[in-house]
């Protein structure tokens, strides 16, 4: 299985305002797991001040996972993203044709 990571910074339509402050952007990590022409996708988007890991910790955990994809990351957001990519890959493999890599959102 080959795994690719891509980081993005997305602009929110409206500022997200919490007791911790406000933000107009979210940083995300997109994951693509590929094997035999099939692809699965996952995403990690830890929000500062919420959750158990920072964006940097999640990215580091996923970068380590890319080196050893047989062991899921311990960091919760990274683990969920990796598990989602693997599950989507398994679902794609059980379908009749390889995926195009495009996702309807």
Region locations from a protein language model:
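N-terminal capping/lid subdomain adjacent to the active-site entrance of alpha/beta enzymes
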Residues: 1-105
């Amino acid at each position: 299985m080959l795994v690719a990571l891509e980081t993005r910074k997305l602009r929110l339509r409206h500022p997200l305002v919490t007791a911790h402050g406000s933000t107009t952007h979210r940083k995300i990590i997109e994951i693509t797991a590929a094997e035999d022409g099939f692809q699965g996708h996952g995403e990690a988007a830890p929000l500062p001040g919420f959750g158990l890991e920072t964006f940097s910790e999640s990215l580091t955990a996923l970068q380590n996972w890319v080196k050893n994809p047989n062991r899921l990351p311990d960091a919760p957001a990274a683990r969920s993203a990796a598990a989602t990519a693997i599950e989507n890959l398994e679902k794609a493999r059980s379908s009749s044709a390889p995926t195009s890599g495009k996702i309807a959102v």
